[in-house]
Amino acid sequence: QATASFGVAPLLLWQVATRHFTNISVETAGNQIRDAKGMQIKLTIQNVRLKNTPNSRGTIGALDATITWSSEGIKESVQNAIPILGAFVTSSVVTHPADGTVELKGLLNNITAKPIVAGKGLELQIINFNTLGFSLPKETVQSTLNEFTSSLTKNYPLGIHADSVQVTSTGVVSRFSTRDAAIPTGIQNPCFSHI
């Protein structure tokens, strides 16, 4: 579920007529984004100009997003990403704002990871990794975490990329943005086919 606002009504009518939207705000309820449970997005989109050309549907001057992912949502997401064993691997998530780490605690393991900006998205860089009763190479676990976070935070359209990430007492907050982005045609990206 999401809510959107376009400004006050008289100005909105003018924006629709001119196909130039100066300020759009969107906020999700915080239930889920992609496969990430407990994730909320607050978007501010500025200077949208709709104009059909062979290569685009128009342009977006600026898009800024604040993405909040709760500790409980991180736990549920990791559990869902590892069917059957998920609850054993991650039974709780504890955040440590002082050192910017997230601790994934399970019956069989304890992983301390630091969320970082990597490429255009985010990664959880393993700081400490302990297992009980079995041995897994740290590289294997790191690779699995990278695939998981990549599927959630990379490959956004419009050149949207991660700018920063911060661990808070309740989860993780990240900032994503793009500037002067061309809106793809429906053929280039089906998500934009009805613009």
Q: Where are the predicted features?
A:
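Extended amphipathic ligand-handling, pore-lining, and cofactor/metal-binding catalytic surfaces
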Residues: 77-89, 96, 118-161
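Residues that act as N-cap/strand-start positions at coil-to-secondary-structure junctions
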Residues: 98, 107-109, 159
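Hydrophobic residues embedded in beta-strands of well-ordered beta-sheets
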Residues: 100-102, 122, 172-173
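A structural signal for short hydrophobic beta-strand segments in well-ordered beta-sheet cores
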Residues: 93-94, 113-117, 164-165
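N-terminal beta-strand/beta-hairpin edge segment
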Residues: 2-84, 92, 97-101
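Beta-strand elements of well-folded, non-transmembrane domains
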Residues: 8-10, 30-32, 45-49, 69-73, ...
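Extracytoplasmic/luminal low-complexity segments enriched in Pro/Gly and acidic/polar residues
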Residues: 136-195
